Amino acid sequence: MKVFSEIPKDLPNTPLLDSINIPEDIKKLNKNQLTALADELREFLLYTVGKSGGHLGAGLGVVELTVALHYIFDTPKDNIVWDVGHQAYPHKIITGRKKEIETIRKKDGLAPFPRRSESEYDVFGVGHSSTSISAALGMAVGNPNKKTIAVIGDGAMTAGMAFEALSHTGHLKPNLLIILNDNDMSISENVGGLSNYFARIWASKLYKGIKKSGKSFLEKLPQTYHLVRKVETQMKGMVAPGTIFEELGLNYIGPIDGHDVNELTEVIGNLKDFDGPQSVSYTHLRAHET
């Protein structure tokens, strides 16, 4: 990830970003070009919001995730629901609104939040926080043939509405991916080689296949099955604070590095075709706005 110490005053050179008119264009890139695309997207976001005003922090924290999600999923057929509209600035830029991004918060300009009437890529009109899981749950249940993703921050997860939706998700078990965008030290302390290694294992199809076949066999031996399940849960708890997700019936992966677009595409890509509710947490450095 390229780090910027100040907001660019001149229009940056962004050849890769300039080639992206719709998310489908991202799929034409080589995977090793995604990091460069994310760097260009971050620099362009800094430049445009620096000129027009707006909220930088939330958008900067999801640059790599935005690139990864649109690279992996088939938008707008698949649904991406953003919690807190300020996260959606990068999403707007790569969904055909790059030239208009400077009009955010201006008369007759782009909305500062996702708006359904503005773009087919904005699947839910969001403003305030903590609504994404509920909205995404309804979409996932209503149309199970689509992939549905909710992106929610750690602050928004403290609201009762989010927990209620999380509990309901565990009960209904739809094909829904919940991504927790976290910049708090309580999770970031766990980010490292061991955490990333296990995250890749738990998100792999090989692990899922072994787990599924092993479960069928071990269920015939109740005492052994419960022991193995407990060990698995404890191992996940040692390297990732996902106990609450697991207890509510969601498969939990993470935390992973939210500034590593290759790791995001690998882990989330592996989860794409899994059945049932999945949850991933990722950490990032929060931008300081002045």
PLM region spans:
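N-terminal amphipathic, basic-rich helices that act as targeting or association modules
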Residues: 6-92, 257, 261
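Gly-rich Lys/Arg/Thr-decorated short loops/hinges at beta-loop-alpha junctions or inter-strand turns
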Residues: 16-22, 44, 48, 112-121, ...
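Cofactor-binding active-site loop characterized by glycine-rich and histidine/acidic residues
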Residues: 55-172
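Short gly/pro/ser/thr-enriched loop/turn and capping motifs at secondary-structure boundaries
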Residues: 88, 158, 184-188, 286
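Conserved thiamine diphosphate
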Residues: 141-147, 193-267
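A glycine-rich helix N-cap at a beta->alpha junction
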Residues: 172-180
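Conserved small/polar residues in nucleotide/adenosyl-binding loops
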Residues: 283-290
